[in-house]
């Protein structure tokens, strides 16, 4: 019954209940469930079912408890549930069950019952029962599995990660069975967040996490996730998936717990397509116990490799998916048992306490690190945890090391900081107490030996010694001048730079420069220096003209540089006049208003934007103003007289006339016109003597000298004679004095004040006279001054300093003079400048400073002159406010006397004198060495500031001189071509920018001539300029055949002598030279490392003797390659290899092949032909272009004509940063990096961590760089001269599935500290490409490229990458398509003291870091930025253009008819000169007495066609026999014919080239045919298997197991699909793909896709790029028929046949034809990769008739891989491409083929 709880106010619901319910329903109750039933389904599980109650209810509460008492477990169920499974029960125990329905807060009466599980094995303590809910009807949850047999009741918990194979081979139906299996698996465990956790990952081509361990909290949630697990689809890359869960699932962030058992369960149905051993080993070693469950096609041996031991309990394998349920109970029991055992082990180890380590010791303390050592703890320690933090506070850091380690280095610390340290011993579940201590780091090291040099007007350089460990440097620099002190600048640079330029400085300014070494964000103590910039350039060549009495004209030459004008300062010599004017940028200027007869000093300054220059100085004296030569007084009267003079010229000005009574009075004056010559002075006093003065006043205000005359007016009593004499009274004479208290005081150096008291008011005037007291008493008066009678003081001026004067004052009355009064006075001594100081000494300047005098000054005059050498006395003037000056243009290392005068009102003061000295700009320790008869060398100690040296060699016999200039860093120079026994003077001048110091000289005499003259001229040819930087391994090959003769051979030797003499440095640091003389057999005259000096080398050349014989040039070239260019003979890595061949005739052996090989290997060959030499042969021998490498002279006397050009070309080749290499048929400048890293067939086996694999087309070799191979080479071997400024890096590479997601450097150059300098970084996780380097300023720069074209490089296919670097940009070209370019600065060159590395992980540190695995097929550096635009990507199948690309090696073409296409007929072979190149054929028979003929045309019977993959023969029509023709190009594959008749016998071939090594395939007899495998995505051709024993042709086998479904490939056009199918794959589809029909017919017409025969699917990419090799499947149906070849066992992609014997073409007659080889066994259904050439088999099918030619030997079988005929393309994955479904039978495929698909 249902009881409903209703609210009283809810009348609508009450009404509904009243109408719908039985009358027995009681309001407020919920009806209980009924019909409770029990069903035991396993030994610990029971199913409970019931009938739902009537009415409305919200859900159920199910309570289960042991009847004997114990914990009651309650579960809430949904209202749709009608069943529940209770798990984890114990047998032989009664349980009570209560089931209650509830609605909101009301519950029904419980439906109750009891049950007991009998006859089951005894169990452990009861645990919480688990309930499995089963919905009724159409509930949202599916029903549970019918049977649950086991439940893990252990209290131990675990972290279980299940890894599920979701590849295409499983199928959607089978994947449902996998879900059921997973549900049973999860059900068996007690799952919860605090119990056992279960995570799951699904994988195919790429793994993904479906849910982490901590994703769900209950078992129900986990089961729900299992039921909704999506099917992924893809490839089977189990190794990648195992590594994925190792890196992502068993981590704390993913829910993994410490101290908890870790279980990994793998479920897969096939063999992995990648390596599973390393990732499974990593998981096991990390403590994960692995279980492997294989289904259907799983590889048991692989499962055993993955799982933990023992295999009997950890490996499960079932035949079909519907049998997986049979292993659930066994698996869960084993896992449960192992979890319990591990839990005990974990707890036991946790109980064992660990004592702390002891004896903490710190050592090796630096500023950023120190080492911590301790004594190990007793007991089993898994690891040590070292915790450290700054004492003053900071975040604790820690380092964890292995338990076997007892020390570690703490890095990246702060300098000068105390750190607290604690070391803990850690076991699996416990840790010890900490061992504690402290240590203080040192201060950061600072820069040392700071030096400022190369100083200019606005720049200087600063350098210092590098600081170990510094991450960079901070440079601060600022002027010391007071007004500029705030203009401080800073510069940050990288740690590799210790020499930089500071620019933008002020001229003539002292700067302080401070350098800090930076360690991250920390800075060291500063290193500081001071230096003064040079002054600006002054004007030149001052000329002074038109000097007059008051004017002059200045003219000068302009200053260099951009100026804004000039400042002119002119000063009188006495310092009383200082004038200044600024003018525009003119070169002449008039000076006016000068004082006549005055000496002037001139200073002209250039005015720049930065300031003004030093002055250009000069001096001159103005002329005297003409004085008046005549002045006369007449017409004298009592009150007037006339003054007469000669008038001035009109242009000089006017006259000034002045007069004054001689005995005192007022001076009067009058200005008169210049033409006036007399004037009457009136108003004079009678009987008075007057002084009259006349001077000329010039127009500019200056005055001439004064002309003076004295005249006396008549007394008035003389006007007329008295008529009578009147008597007079007697007169008494009285001496009068009107002066008292005469005082002389207020003394200065040039003045005295005289004062007195007036005692008589009748005094008319006072006469003051003064004279020197020390002089003769009769000495004339120095001066007389008349003052009025009312004045009682006077200031006497212009006196001499420090002089005693006698001053006399006399009163003057009307009637005469009174009594004079005298007093002494003395002037003070003059005060001049004091305390001369010298600073800023430099090579051509010095600064002087002085203290000014106490008194006022007008300026200063500085006079200086060299002491020890005759020279002009120099002087300059400065203003009164200046007390320092820089004396410039001085001589280096010279003493100067300096005098400084102060200009004062009275003249110049006494001189302040001193001695100053400039620095010496000159070398030291100059000495001669290596003195020979005709040469000598000088060496010296380098001057620290020198920018260059000028070396002069003077002969004392004939005064001839040689002069050279070398750089400032050079300390040695040699002179050649000197006279023996002659005295020479060697002078070295040191230069600093434009400044040159004095010479330092020594005398040296060359050695005397030997007693007997040498056979050859003794003069060693001087090195040519073009050869100064030459560095090469140079071999001369000299023809010594009979046709040369003794005389001509000596001419060759003389030519070699001159040529070698042009080289500069001989030996390991320069050019090494070897010599070979060749005839029938080559003879090595000396090896590359035989001589270390030019003298000994030339002497050896002189003594080469003539050999005689025949001309075997080819043999000699091979001898040079194999014998001389070896490490034993001194050849060096990374150095250009140059050969010079000299011959006079045609070679009697083949030169073409060996020459081509050596050119392709990077040798630079010069060929010189004389007389009868064959020019076409010379062209074959010489490198390209022939215009630079091939020379021809008419006779042996004409070598001089080519000598200079040959030397130039050879030295340019030897000096080039980029050597010439042979690439794609042309010679160009660059580096063949594959050879330099040893990644070539002959060398790769010696490189650790590298294997050779098939590359593109399955024909080119590529090299797999395995994980942590860290392939490297020293930079000095690869790029000894660094990288050019512009270059292109070309790579052909492939990213592998196990290439890590972290960034790694595809290639990079490291310095000696393992710091990257330049390189390319690929980020597999971020799908980006980054190029980095240091620019010319020392700054680190990076540019990153991304986008679709970049991302596709990471999808697992081969891609061609060009990175173009120029001075302005970096450009990236992918698969011959430009994808982007970015601006960069010009690159700095690299250091050669580091290494170059392939694949280095970016996070790696130090020389032993990690590297990423990838495949590399090609790597070149071309010294050009245009190479990328010329490349046609011929190595990539999808981009290859057959018309423009060269033929593939050992390849077959794909044509529409599959028939051999004949090329055009070549000319018939025979004796004669070599003709034009014909079709690639065998050499014709040897002609009589002549050189080898050219290859002939193809014969009617073609050679055996290229070898196809091994398979069952499909008989064709018999071929007709014919004569053997020359070897032609490999023809297109035709249908297999029946064996033809026996052809003419041919020669045995030489051994063929070995094929690529591959994985071992399981060999065995061919099995019966099975169903064809499902087509896979286009992938890399598989690796060639090892050669197996010859097997007989087996019968068709029974159908084999179905292969895995491949990834979807890229879309191709319908036209391409049909064309490729018709042309190539007709017979393949007819014989092997008969089962493809029904599904393929469902493919839309416009989105068809080509799939190759089953191969390992690659990452989404363009279809043509190869994927990783697939494992060998079971034997399949007959493969595509190939021509009869040598038998081989079926292996990966077609095993190679027995190695054939193919040799170099001989010149003898053709040998007999070899017997046909045995037939090959049938192969598997997949096309094989090309194997090595087999020996000649039976005659192949008939080809097209060719032009009859001579019988040729059997051709070398080639390879024809049908997969290479598939439509390769470049592309990315297409998510919208329709999914392929496996073809079920052959009829479907036949139907599809007939439909034209």
From Swiss-Prot:
The keyword Glycoprotein applies. Residues 1655-1780 are annotated as: Triple-helical region 2 (COL1). Glycans are attached at residues 94, 138, 373, 1385, 1389. Residues 1537-1546 have a biased composition (Gly residues). It is found in: Secreted, Extracellular space, Extracellular matrix. Residues 124-145, 1463-1611, 1645-1797 are annotated as: Disordered. InterPro entries: Collagen, ConA-like_dom_sf, ECM_Assembly_Org, FN3_dom, FN3_sf, Ig-like_fold, TSPN-like_N, VWF_A. A motif (Cell attachment site) lies at residues 1608-1610. Residues 1463-1511, 1515-1571, 1572-1610, 1655-1706, 1708-1758 form the Collagen-like domain. Residues 159-331, 1033-1206 form the VWFA domain. Residues 1474-1486, 1574-1584, 1742-1758 have a biased composition (Low complexity). GO terms for cellular component: collagen trimer; collagen-containing extracellular matrix; extracellular space; interstitial matrix. Its main location: secreted. Residues 1-28 form the signal peptide. Coiled coil: none annotated. Lysines at the third position of the tripeptide repeating unit (G-X-Y) are hydroxylated in all cases and bind carbohydrates. Residues 32-122, 356-445, 446-537, 538-625, 627-716, 738-830, 832-922, 923-1014 form the Fibronectin type-III domain. Residues 1460-1611 are annotated as: Triple-helical region 1 (COL2). Plays an adhesive role by integrating collagen bundles. It is probably associated with the surface of interstitial collagen fibrils via COL1. The COL2 domain may then serve as a rigid arm which sticks out from the fibril and protrudes the large N-terminal globular domain into the extracellular space, where it might interact with other matrix molecules or cell surface receptors. Belongs to the fibril-associated collagens with interrupted helices (FACIT) family. This is Collagen alpha-1(XIV) chain. The gene is Col14a1.
């Amino acid at each position: 019954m249902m009881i409903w709880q209703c609210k009283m106010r809810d009348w609508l619901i009450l009404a509904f209940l009243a109408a719908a319910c039985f009358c027995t329903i009681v309001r407020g109750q919920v009806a209980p469930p009924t019909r409770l039933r029990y069903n035991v389904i396993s030994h610990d599980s029971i199913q409970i079912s019931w009938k739902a109650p009537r009415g409305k209810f919200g859900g159920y509460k199910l309570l289960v408890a042991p009847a004997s008492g114990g914990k009651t477990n309650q579960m809430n169920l949904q209202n749709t549930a009608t069943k529940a499974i209770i798990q984890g029960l114990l047998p032989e125990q009664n349980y009570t069950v209560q089931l209650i329905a509830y609605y909101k807060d009301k519950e029904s009466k419980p439906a109750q019952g009891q049950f007991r599980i009998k006859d089951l094995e005894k169990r452990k303590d009861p645990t919480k029962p688990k309930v499995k809910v089963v919905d009724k009807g159409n509930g949202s949850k599916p029903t549970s599995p019918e049977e649950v047999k086991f439940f893990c009741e252990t209290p131990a918990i675990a972290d279980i990660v299940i890894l599920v194979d979701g590849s295409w081979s499983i199928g959607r139906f089978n994947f449902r069975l996998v879900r059921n299996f997973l549900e049973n698996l999860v059900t068996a465990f007690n799952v919860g967040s605090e119990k056992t956790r279960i995570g799951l990952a699904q994988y195919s081509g790429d793994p993904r996490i479906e849910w982490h361990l901590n994703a769900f909290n209950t078992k129900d949630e986990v089961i729900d996730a299992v039921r909704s697990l999506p099917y992924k689809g893809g490839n089977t890359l189990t190794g990648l998936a195992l590594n994925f869960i190792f890196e992502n699932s068993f981590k704390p962030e993913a829910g993994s717990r410490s101290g908890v058992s870790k279980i990994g369960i793998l479920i897969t149905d096939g063999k992995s397509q990648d390596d599973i051993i390393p990732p499974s080993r990593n998981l096991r070693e990390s403590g994960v116990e692995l279980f492997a469950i294989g289904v259907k096609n799983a590889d048991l041996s692989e499962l055993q490799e993955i799982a933990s031991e023992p295999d009997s309990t950890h490996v499960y394998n079932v035949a079909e998916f519907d049998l997986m349920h049979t292993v659930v109970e066994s698996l869960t029991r084993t896992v449960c048992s192992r979890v319990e055992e591990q839990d005990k082990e974990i707890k036991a180890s946790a109980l064992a306490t660990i004592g702390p380590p002891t004896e903490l010791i710190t050592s090796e303390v630096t500023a950023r690190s120190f080492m911590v050592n301790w004594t190990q703890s007793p007991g089993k320690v898994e690891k040590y945890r070292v915790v450290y933090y700054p004492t003053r506070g900071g975040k604790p850091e820690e380092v964890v090391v292995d338990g076997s380690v007892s020390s570690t280095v703490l890095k990246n610390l702060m300098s000068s900081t105390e750190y607290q340290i604690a070391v803990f011993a850690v076991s699996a579940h416990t840790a010890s107490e900490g061992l504690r201590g402290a240590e203080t780091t040192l201060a950061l090291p600072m820069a040392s030996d700071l030096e400022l040099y190369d100083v200019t007007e606005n720049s200087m350089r600063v350098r210092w010694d590098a600081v170990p460990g510094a991450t960079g440097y901070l440079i601060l620099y600022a002027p010391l001048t007071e007004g500029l002190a705030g203009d401080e600048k800073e510069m940050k640079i990288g740690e590799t730079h210790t020499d930089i330029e500071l620019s933008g400085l002020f001229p003539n300014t002292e700067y302080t420069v401070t350098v800090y070494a930076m360690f991250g964000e920390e800075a060291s103590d500063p290193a500081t220096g001071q230096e003064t910039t040079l002054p600006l350039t002054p004007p030149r060549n001052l000329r002074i003209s038109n000097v007059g009495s008051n004017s002059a004209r200045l003219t000068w030459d302009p200053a260099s540089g951009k100026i804004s004008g000039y400042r002119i300062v002119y000063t009188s010599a006495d310092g009383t006049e200082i004038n200044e004017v600024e003018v525009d940028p003119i070169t002449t200027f008039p000076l006016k208003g000068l004082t006549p007869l005055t000496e002037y000093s001139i200073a002209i300054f250039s005015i720049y934007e930065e300031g003004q220059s030093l002055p250009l100085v000069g001096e001159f004296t103005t002329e005297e103003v003409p004085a008046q030569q005549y002045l006369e007084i007449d017409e004298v009267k009592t009150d007037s007289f006339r003054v007469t003079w000669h008038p001035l010229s009109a242009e000089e000005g006017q006259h000034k006339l002045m007069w004054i009574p001689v005995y005192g009075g007022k001076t009067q004056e009058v200005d008169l016109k210049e033409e006036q010559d007399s004037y009457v002075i009136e108003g004079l006093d009678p009987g008075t003597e007057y002084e009259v003065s006349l001077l000329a006043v010039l127009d500019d205000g200056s005055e001439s000298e004064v002309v003076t005359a004295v005249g006396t007016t008549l007394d008035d009593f003389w006007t007329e004679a008295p008529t009578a004499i009147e008597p007079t009274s007697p007169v008494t004479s009285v001496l009068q004095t009107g002066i008292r208290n005469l005082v002389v005081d207020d003394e200065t150096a040039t003045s005295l004040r005289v004062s007195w008291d007036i005692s008589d008011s009748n005094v008319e005037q006072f006469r003051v006279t003064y004279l020197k007291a020390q002089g003769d008493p009769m000495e004339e008066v120095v001066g007389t001054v008349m003052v009025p009678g009312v004045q009682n003081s006077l200031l006497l001026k212009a006196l001499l300093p420090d002089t005693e004067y006698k001053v006399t004052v006399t009163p003057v009355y009307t009637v005469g003079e009174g009594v004079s009064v005298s007093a002494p006075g003395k002037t003070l001594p003059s005060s001049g400048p004091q305390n001369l100081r010298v600073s800023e000494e430099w090579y051509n300047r010095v600064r002087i400073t002085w203290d000014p005098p106490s008194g006022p000054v007008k300026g200063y005059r500085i006079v200086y002159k060299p002491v020890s050498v005759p020279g002009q006395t120099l002087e300059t003037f400065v203003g009164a406010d200046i007390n320092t000056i820089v004396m410039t243009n001085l001589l280096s290392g010279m003493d100067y006397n300096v005098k400084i005068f102060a200009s004062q009102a009275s003249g110049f003061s006494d001189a302040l004198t001193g001695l100053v000295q400039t620095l010496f700009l000159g070398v030291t320790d100059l000495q001669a060495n290596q003195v020979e008869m005709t040469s000598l060398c000088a060496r010296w100690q380098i001057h620290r500031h020198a920018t260059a040296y000028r070396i002069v060699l003077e002969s004392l016999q004939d005064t001839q001189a040689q002069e050279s200039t070398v750089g400032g860093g050079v300390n040695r120079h040699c002179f050649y071509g000197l006279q023996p026994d002659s005295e020479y003077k060697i002078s070295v001048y040191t230069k600093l920018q434009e400044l040159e110091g004095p010479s330092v000289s020594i005398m040296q005499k060359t050695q005397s001539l030997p007693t007997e003259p040498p056979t050859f001229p003794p003069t060693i040819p001087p090195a040519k300029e073009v050869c100064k930087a030459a560095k090469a391994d140079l071999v001369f090959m000299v023809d010594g055949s009979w046709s040369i003769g003794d005389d001509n051979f000596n001419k060759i030797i003389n030519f070699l002598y001159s040529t070698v003499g042009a080289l500069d440095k001989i030996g390991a640091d320069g050019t090494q030279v070897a010599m070979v003389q060749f005839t029938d057999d080559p003879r090595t005259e000396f090896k590359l490392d035989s001589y270390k000096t030019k003298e000994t080398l030339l002497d050896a050349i002189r003594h080469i003797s003539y050999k005689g014989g025949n001309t075997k040039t080819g043999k000699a070239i091979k001898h040079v390659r194999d014998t001389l260019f070896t490490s034993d003979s001194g050849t060096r890595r990374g150095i250009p290899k140059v050969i010079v061949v000299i011959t006079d005739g045609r070679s009697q052996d083949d030169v073409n092949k060996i020459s081509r090989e050596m050119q392709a290997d990077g040798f630079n060959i010069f060929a010189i032909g004389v007389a009868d030499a064959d020019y076409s042969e010379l062209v074959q021998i010489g490198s390209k272009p022939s215009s630079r490498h091939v020379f021809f002279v008419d006779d042996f006397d004409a070598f001089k004509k080519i000598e200079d050009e040959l030397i130039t070309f050879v030295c340019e080749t030897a000096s080039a940063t980029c050597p010439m290499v042979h690439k794609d048929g042309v010679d160009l400048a660059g580096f063949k990096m594959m050879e330099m890293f040893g990644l070539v067939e002959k060398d790769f086996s010696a490189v650790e961590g590298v294997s050779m694999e098939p590359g593109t087309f399955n024909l080119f070799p590529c090299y797999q760089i395995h994980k942590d191979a860290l392939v490297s080479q020293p930079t000095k071997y690869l790029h000894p001269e660094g990288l050019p400024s512009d270059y292109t890096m070309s790579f052909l590479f492939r990213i592998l599935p196990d290439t890590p997601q972290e960034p790694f450097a595809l290639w990079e150059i490291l310095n000696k500290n393992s710091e990257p300098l330049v390189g390319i970084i690929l980020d597999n996780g971020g799908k980006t490409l980054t190029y980095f380097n240091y620019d010319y300023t020392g700054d680190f720069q990076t540019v990153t490229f991304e986008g679709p074209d970049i991302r596709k490089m990471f999808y697992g296919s081969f891609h061609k990458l060009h990175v173009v670097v120029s001075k302005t940009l970096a450009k990236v070209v992918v698969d011959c398509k430009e994808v982007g370019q970015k601006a960069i600065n010009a690159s700095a060159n690299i250091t050669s003291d580091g290494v170059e590395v392939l694949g280095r992980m970016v996070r790696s540190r130090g020389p032993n870091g990690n590297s990423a695995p990838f495949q590399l097929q090609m790597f070149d550096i071309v010294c050009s930025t245009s190479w990328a635009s010329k490349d046609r990507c011929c190595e990539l199948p999808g981009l290859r253009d057959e018309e423009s690309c060269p033929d593939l090696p050992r390849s077959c073409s794909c044509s529409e008819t599959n028939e051999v296409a004949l090329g055009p007929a070549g000319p018939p072979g025979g004796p004669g000169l070599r003709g034009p190149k014909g079709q690639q054929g065998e050499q014709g028979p040897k002609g009589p007495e002549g050189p080898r003929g050219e290859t002939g045309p193809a014969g009617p019977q073609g050679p055996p066609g290229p070898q196809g993959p091994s398979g069952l023969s499909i008989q064709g029509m018999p071929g007709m026999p014919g004569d053997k023709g020359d070897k032609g190009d490999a023809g297109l594959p035709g249908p297999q014919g029946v064996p033809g008749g026996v052809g003419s016998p041919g020669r045995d071939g030489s051994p063929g080239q070995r094929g690529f090594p591959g994985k071992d395939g399981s060999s065995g007899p061919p099995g019966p045919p099975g169903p064809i495998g499902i087509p896979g995505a286009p992938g890399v051709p598989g690796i060639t298997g090892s050669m197996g024993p010859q097997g007989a042709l087996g019968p068709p086998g029974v159908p084999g197991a179905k292969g895995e479904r491949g990834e979807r490939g890229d879309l191709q056009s319908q036209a391409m699909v049909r064309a490729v199918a018709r042309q190539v794959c007709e017979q393949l589809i007819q014989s092997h793909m008969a089962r493809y029909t029904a599904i393929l017919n469902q493919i839309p017409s416009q989105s068809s896709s080509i799939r190759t025969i089953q191969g390992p699917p690659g990452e989404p990419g363009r279809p043509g790029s190869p994927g990783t090799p697939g494992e060998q499947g079971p034997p399949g149906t007959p493969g595509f028929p190939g021509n009869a070849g040598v038998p081989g066992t079926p292996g990966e992609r077609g095993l190679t046949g027995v190695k054939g014997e193919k040799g170099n073409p001989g010149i003898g007659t053709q040998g007999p034809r070899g017997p046909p080889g045995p037939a090959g066994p049938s192969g598997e259904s997949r096309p094989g990769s090309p194997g090595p050439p087999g020996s000649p088999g039976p005659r192949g099918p008939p080809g097209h008739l060719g032009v009859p030619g001579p019988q040729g030997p059997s051709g070398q079988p080639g390879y024809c891989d049908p997969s290479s005929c598939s439509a390769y393309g470049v592309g990315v994955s297409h998510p919208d491409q329709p999914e392929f479904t496996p073809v079920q039978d052959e009829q479907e495929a036949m139907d599809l083929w007939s439909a034209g698909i």
